[in-house]
């Protein structure tokens, strides 16, 4: 893989999760452009820089030890990539503090480097949080590959930060620079709320949760077919989102024990708040993680999963395949994985390579619900 070479450093970077013979690199031209732009401004060593949505740590690791850097984002895999890439390049483990998107950072910051996220609601929430956290004369510099840079990103920066200047294109990347100006303090419109009729639930979604404004159609197809009569089963909701699968299952299985895990900090935050609203103080475990990678082998009886088919702008089934493998490792012999997926993704044949038996529980014209037994 090529090295990331910038005026700040030459780094050997890897993506997360790691894949054998991964054809994708851990940085792109937008990362290079952001670092070059910052270097051209010649900030001194005391310059406090906030890095937002740094996919695999390319920005923060490049600046580690040279400026006062804080990184923040919603991806646990992004956090893990930053830690691994710091170590991989001989940089101190703690040289870049990381603040999950479910928490708030503390300014003031002189510069903010932003990778424009796929979900503009996350960008809006971050820009609102920046109000009152920027030093006089501060700049917010957002970067993206042009094909992933919507006009609305600049509009949001103008609305919440100040006047925006777009750069020339360079290697198919573009920067948007907002100089801090007086703006009215905004009230965040997040989390979003919606009501589910069956089961009767009022649910909230923080800004970066998938299908933020309502129940996604895959989950809607899955809900009527969740397993019942689980007794004291140990159940995990893998890629839990706002927790609706686990909550619906828990309402039907009052003795079961639940673990809710997602790689999105805002998803886990949403799930925890929704669980509390629906089930009160009933115990459950919540954490942001690389799926079930940290769980003991054969520690679960049931796994529920509505697997994602993209990582940021990269589409594919590699994340789903990884989740299926993790579920197999975590399940006891005789345990079961229940999933929902688009028909065209061919999950039945993939599961058959890992599990003793795979059966179709239900189907709609678009989705299939499968049960795979270990």
From Swiss-Prot:
A single cellular component GO annotation: cytoplasm
UniProt KW keywords: Cytoplasm, Methyltransferase, rRNA processing, S-adenosyl-L-methionine, Transferase
Gene3D superfamilies xrefs: Vaccinia Virus protein VP39
Keyword Transferase: yes
Localization per Swiss-Prot or TrEMBL: Cytoplasm
InterPro entries (alphabetical): DNA_methylase_N6_adenine_CS (IPR002052), rRNA_m2G-MeTrfase_RlmG (IPR017237), RsmC/RlmG (IPR046977), SAM-dependent_MTases_sf (IPR029063), Small_mtfrase_dom (IPR007848)
Reaction catalyzed: guanosine(1835) in 23S rRNA + S-adenosyl-L-methionine = N(2)-methylguanosine(1835) in 23S rRNA + S-adenosyl-L-homocysteine + H(+)
Keyword Secreted: no
A molecular function (GO) term: 23S rRNA (guanine(1835)-N(2))-methyltransferase activity
Cross-referenced SUPFAM superfamilies: S-adenosyl-L-methionine-dependent methyltransferases
Family annotation (Pfam families): MTS
Superkingdom of origin organism: Bacteria
Coiled-coil spans in chain: none
Name of the top EC class for this enzyme: transferase
EC number: 2.1.1.174
Family listed: Belongs to the methyltransferase superfamily. RlmG family.
Entry function: Specifically methylates the guanine in position 1835 (m2G1835) of 23S rRNA.
Identification of the protein by name: Ribosomal RNA large subunit methyltransferase G
Designated gene of the protein: rlmG
């Amino acid at each position: 893989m090529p090295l990331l070479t910038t005026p700040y450093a030459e780094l050997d970077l890897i993506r997360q999760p790691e894949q054998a013979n991964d054809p994708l690199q851990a940085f792109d031209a937008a990362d290079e452009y952001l670092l070059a732009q910052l270097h051209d401004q010649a900030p001194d060593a005391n310059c406090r820089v906030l890095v937002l949505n740094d996919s695999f740590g390319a920005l923060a690791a490049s600046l580690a030890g040279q400026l006062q850097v804080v990184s923040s984002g919603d991806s646990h895999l992004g956090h893990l990539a930053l830690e691994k890439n710091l170590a991989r390049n001989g940089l101190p483990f703690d040289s870049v503090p990381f603040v999950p998107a479910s928490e708030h950072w503390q300014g003031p910051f002189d510069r903010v480097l932003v990778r424009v996220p796929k979900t503009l609601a996350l960008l809006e929430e971050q820009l609102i949080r920046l109000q009152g956290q920027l030093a006089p004369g501060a700049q917010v510099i957002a970067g993206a590959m042009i094909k992933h840079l919507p006009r609305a990103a600049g509009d949001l920066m103008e609305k919440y930060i100040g006047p925006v200047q777009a750069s020339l294109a360079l290697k198919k990347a573009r920067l948007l620079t907002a100089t801090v100006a007086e703006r009215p303090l905004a009230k965040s419109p997040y989390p979003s709320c919606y009501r589910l009729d069956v089961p009767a639930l009022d649910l909230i979604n923080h800004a970066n949760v998938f299908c933020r404004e309502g129940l996604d159609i895959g989950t809607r197809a899955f809900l009527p077919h969740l397993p019942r009569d689980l007794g004291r089963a140990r159940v995990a909701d893998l890629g839990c989102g706002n927790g609706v699968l686990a909550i619906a299952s828990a309402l039907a299985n009052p003795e079961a024990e639940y673990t809710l895990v997602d790689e999105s900090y805002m998803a886990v935050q949403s799930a925890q708040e929704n669980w509390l609203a629906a089930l009160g103080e009933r115990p459950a475990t919540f954490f942001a993680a690389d799926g079930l990678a940290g769980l003991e082998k054969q520690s679960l009886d049931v796994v529920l999963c509505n697997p994602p088919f993209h990582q940021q702008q990269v589409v594919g089934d590699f994340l789903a395949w990884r989740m299926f493998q993790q579920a197999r490792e975590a399940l006891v012999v005789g345990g079961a994985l229940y999933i929902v997926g688009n028909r065209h993704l061919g999950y039945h044949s993939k599961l058959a390579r890992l599990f003793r038996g795979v059966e179709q529980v239900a189907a709609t014209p678009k989705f299939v619900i499968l049960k795979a037994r270990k």
